[in-house]
UniProtKB/Swiss-Prot annotation:
One of the GO biological process terms: regulation of transcription by RNA polymerase II
Region (Leucine-zipper): 269-290
Domain of life: Eukaryota
Compartmental location: Nucleus
Bias-annotated ranges (Low complexity): 54-65, 72-82, 314-327
Region: Basic motif, residue numbers: 241-266
Cellular component GO terms, alphabetical: nucleus
Protein name: Transcription factor Maf
Subunit field text: Homodimer or heterodimer. Binds DNA as a homodimer or a heterodimer.
Domain bZIP: 241-304
Length: 327
């Protein structure tokens, strides 16, 4: 079939009308007769592809069935344009092999292609060498510019897939380094509580020193200005703690003072109450005494009146000047 497609330079149309006629002609009406594939070359090709693992697991497309028949490398007939025929055969081979390089034609994702390429690195190396050889061979001829472009795009696809596979292979190493760094981080985290405990234990002597430096009485009696002057150079936490302690002590002193004042006032009031009750009792006694005196004086008065009336009645006849005489 490749030999039938290979045309000599004299058979190629040159006029625009002929080219337009060829373009308008429907070539799909004709059946293309396929030549039988050489058994030894197809078997070697299949064995080479299967050795590294199948590129696709779908039953609709297999490496052996999708590989086009290899070109015939028979000796060119004299006078038929051997150089251009070789270029046309190479172009036909590369356009057919493009199905293997296109992942969409095979029906799998780029991730599947990367996994397949990782599992078959040897196959990729051999195919890369073969593609480069075909690219150099097609670029050597004068009429192989189109084949060189197709092969260049194929080589670009292969190199891109190889780079993706290398990047994916390098990813586990990166994670491995992260796993190596994690234990160190854990050690740091485990060491941090110890450092905090050491800092806390180191802070306790500071607490004891400040507590010994300022007694409760000094904190209560010391003014705020003097306390701030004494606490220069001390950490903020210690200053807050001491001021809170001073406030607590002063509040406690205020509460005790108020309680004492209330007790004292209660005692005073109770004493005054007792004194007043004593005065009331004394006044009651005075009242009773005065009542007795009054009664005595009244009785005496009544006696005097009665005795005086009798005396006046006996002497009224002899005394005409008395009031009863004129009546």
């Amino acid at each position: 079939m490749a030999s039938e497609l290979a045309m000599s330079s004299s058979d190629l149309p040159t006029s625009p009308l002929a080219m337009e006629y060829v373009n308008d002609f429907d070539l799909m009406k004709f059946e293309v007769k396929k030549e039988p594939v050489e058994p030894d070359r197809s078997i070697s090709q299949c064995s080479r592809l299967i050795a590294g693992g199948s590129l696709s697991s779908t039953p609709m497309s297999t490496p052996c069935s999708s590989v086009p028949p290899s070109p015939s490398f028979s000796a060119p007939s004299p006078g038929s344009g051997s150089e251009q025929k070789a270029h046309l055969e190479d172009f036909y081979w590369m356009t057919g092999y493009q199905q293997q390089l296109n992942p969409e034609a095979l029906g799998f994702s780029p991730e599947d292609a990367v996994e397949a390429l990782i599992s078959s690195s040897h196959q990729l190396q051999s195919f890369d060498g073969y593609a480069r050889g075909q690219q150099f061979g097609s670029a050597a001829g004068a009429g192989g510019a189109m084949a060189g472009e197709e092969m260049g795009s194929a080589a670009a696809v292969v190199s891109a897939v190889i780079a993706a596979a290398a990047a994916q292979n390098g990813a586990p190493h990166h994670h491995h380094h992260h796993h190596h760094h994690h234990p160190a981080g854990h050690h740091h985290h485990h060491a941090a509580p110890g450092a905090q405990s050491n800092g806390a234990s180191a802070g306790h002597p500071g607490h004891m020193h400040l507590d010994e430096r300022f007694s409760d009485e000094q904190l209560v009696n010391m003014s705020v200005r003097e306390l701030n002057r004494q606490l220069r150079g001390v950490s903020k936490e210690e200053v807050i703690r001491l001021k809170q302690k001073r406030r607590t002590l002063k509040n406690r002193g205020y509460a005790q003072s108020c309680r004492y004042k209330r007790v004292q006032q209660r005692h005073v009031l109770e004493g005054e109450k007792t004194q007043l009750m004593q005065q009331v009792d004394h006044l009651k006694q005075e009242i009773s005494r005065l009542v007795r005196e009054r009664d005595a004086y009244k009785e005496k008065y009544e006696k005097l009146i009665s005795s005086g009336f009798r005396e006046n009645g006996s002497s009224s006849d002899n005394n005409p000047s008395s009031p009863e005489f004129f009546m």
